């Protein structure tokens, strides 16, 4: 079940250290999309908390990794999470630490710093409803050995994808899509990153509907 990803304690004590952070607090930037439109660096997770108060997260994977040192074996938790507002923004991150909560906090921080806008649309030739329930065109993303292809689907199709991809797509606000996957999709982090990279590519092309805006 998705849970709130907002770090209220950190947000309450947040003192911006970057120019973008100061612009957000001063009201000169009022949306996360504005940051991406202006190609500004996103270096503080509190910026995401501030601009997306409805941000949620879902845990994708928890594992224990071991490292052999002179002192013996050291075990640490590795947590993989996806964050999103279910309305056009999504990010994936991982964190390692001896304690689970510390690893979770690191994963959430990384996911927020890796958040990306997602262009939604109705790109299937079988559907012309015009609602942003799918993606506008076919996109591909890669991470490690994993390659993911996302294809627009008509309304009512649902998310035809594996569990990891479904969680990422839901957090992005995508309701209908077909997927093709290649490579070692059992590697949760790479699978999730490949999906996010595919969604990020929805903004690498200017669709006809955006010609007048460009």
Curated annotation (Swiss-Prot):
Residues 55-118 form the S5 DRBM domain. One of its GO terms (molecular function) is rRNA binding. GO terms for biological process: translation. The keyword Ribosomal protein applies. Keywords: Ribonucleoprotein, Ribosomal protein, RNA-binding, rRNA-binding. Pfam families: Ribosomal_S5, Ribosomal_S5_C. InterPro entries: Ribosomal_Su5_D2-typ_SF (IPR020568), Ribosomal_uS5 (IPR000851), Ribosomal_uS5_arc (IPR047866), Ribosomal_uS5_C (IPR005324), Ribosomal_uS5_euk/arc (IPR005711), Ribosomal_uS5_N (IPR013810), Ribosomal_uS5_N_CS (IPR018192), Ribsml_uS5_D2-typ_fold_subgr (IPR014721). GO terms for cellular component: cytosolic small ribosomal subunit. Part of the 30S ribosomal subunit. Contacts protein S4. HAMAP family: Ribosomal_uS5_A. NCBIfam families: PRK04044.1, uS5_euk_arch. PANTHER family: 40S RIBOSOMAL PROTEIN S2, RIBOSOMAL S SUBUNIT. Belongs to the universal ribosomal protein uS5 family. The N-terminal domain interacts with the head of the 30S subunit; the C-terminal domain interacts with the body and contacts protein S4. The interaction surface between S4 and S5 is involved in control of translational fidelity. With S4 and S12 plays an important role in translational accuracy. This is Small ribosomal subunit protein uS5. It comes from Staphylothermus marinus (strain ATCC 43588 / DSM 3639 / JCM 9404 / F1).
